[in-house]
Amino acid sequence: MARRAIPVRRIVLKTVLIIGEGDTEKAFLDHLKRLYVTRGCGVAVTVRNAHGKGPGNVIDAAIRHAKNGDFDIVAVLMDTDLPWTDEVRKSAREHRVCMVGATPCVDGLLLQILGEHVPEQSSRCKDFFHARLDRKPFVREAYEQDFSKALLDEKGKTIPSLRKLLALMAGQLLASD
């Protein structure tokens, strides 16, 4: 008598697509994914890069990428230095895209996480942050030393944008603050 195969129990993963506005956003999101999304956690996170060009392009990139896959949650991380027009907000709402803003830019958010002073101008934030990371903010490895899981967990309690990103990494969608 032949052995009967034991059926493999498969779990359905919650799928999350997060689009970063540029290279820095993608590298930071990849770092978060590496820290928070582990095998067997029930979540599959995909990170993509919209390559800039403003909020409209980032939302369009999210919509295009979402059409190529069946994602439970679609979100974008983008700067707030350029205005989010009503048209951009409407498009995001219609396509169920969660918008996470980094004020005034992702470099400012990262400086805030580190407890550093955050200048009002995006260009100054970029200069300060690039100097802080030895000018290598476009690769995931640049974040390993300064952005530990313990620091991110602690700062996630007080920084709304980071709290949303950490929730997305867990497959949860937080209501807008």
Feature-to-residue mapping (PLM):
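C-terminal accessory helical subdomains adjacent to catalytic cores in phosphodiester-
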Residues: 1-15, 26-49, 56, 60-177
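Helix N-cap/beta->alpha junction signal
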Residues: 21-22
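Short, surface-exposed binding/anchoring microloops in extracellular/periplasmic proteins
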Residues: 18
